[in-house]
Amino acid sequence: MNELLLNLVDPLHQWFLGLGDGGVVLWSVLKILLIAVPVIVSVAFYVVWERKLIGWMHVRHGPMYVGMGIFQAFADVFKLLFKEILQPSSSHKAMFIIAPLLTLAPAFAAWSVVPFDAKLVLSNANVGLLYLLAMTSLGVYGIILAGWASNSKYAFLGAMRSAAQVVSYEIAMGFALVGVMIASGSVNLSQIVFAQAGNSGFFDWFLIPLFPLFIVYWVSGVAETNRAPFDVVEGESEIVAGHMVEYSGGAFALFFLAEYANMILVSFLISIFFLGGWLSPIQGWVNADISPWIDWLWKGGWPWLLMKVFFFASAYIWFRASFPRYRYDQIMRLGWKVFIPLTIVWIAVTALMVFYGVIQKGV
């Protein structure tokens, strides 16, 4: 399947290059659209899946109309886009509009270094991991700006909570990725996946030797995206809707889109860093060439990556339906007193495992 896709892309790339400088610009725009459009569509269907799955957990049907519920999210988007963006008279007009854009931009920019397969990546950067850390940290600036520009006590309190929460869990996430970097010997995301390849299938993945770091990264990812049970940033029962309380229409939709795009992104990154990305869990167990449509089951491919992502994306929904919201002090205590010390200890353990050959790079 990958070869068929590449056979279509390569001639198209050469045709654009033949157009000169304008063709290079058009090709860059096309690559951006090839990332942005699928992400937007994925968010739409993810919202439908969330409402449907929570409905089943609550023993009800969930969305049933608008194309049997499939196109419910698209109907919601059209509703929001046609609503007026109301600005409080005391707000900072320019910053009020810039804030949702500043939140959305990093959420989309981070996708440029995410590999979907060995060859399906927009930019195979050698500093991809560092780039991701930078991009995922920038989104909080839009939230802080929204809280300040709204000139609302609830919005400002939500923004301050977000800043403290992101700073707290960004440290734990960064330390967890230091362990991944030590185990793989690279900060290139594709090389991190290749480091988990081998003849033992899922036993070669970093999930087993780096399991504590996997748990820390997963939970910290939930906290970074401000999702339940860490959604004190927009806690409805406490501060109405936090930094989004004054936003409506398309501006609110941009915050919503950024949040769900980040949730899908974190699901991808967990799969890449700890579960072998596109690698098959039975890779190396079967050596057969039957058909390109079947061989991916044991050779690996993007369908495996999407299945792993689907699991973690669904886990976000499961957390929301199952766990109550933590108190703010409990969230801070978990980040500073549990996760950060645990990651520091396991970085040392990981270094020892690499030194003594317990963790070996893939073939």
Curated annotation (Swiss-Prot):
Keywords: Cell inner membrane, Cell membrane, Membrane, NAD, Quinone, Translocase, Transmembrane, Transmembrane helix, Ubiquinone. PANTHER family: NADH DEHYDROGENASE SUBUNIT 1, NADH-UBIQUINONE OXIDOREDUCTASE CHAIN 1. The chain crosses the membrane at residues 29-49, 62-82, 96-116, 127-147, 163-183, 202-222, 238-257, 264-286, 299-319, 339-359. One of its GO terms (molecular function) is oxidoreductase activity, acting on NAD(P)H, quinone or similar compound as acceptor. This is NADH-quinone oxidoreductase subunit H. InterPro entries: NADH_UbQ_OxRdtase_su1/FPO, NADH_UbQ_OxRdtase_su1_CS. It catalyses: a quinone + NADH + 5 H(+)(in) = a quinol + NAD(+) + 4 H(+)(out).
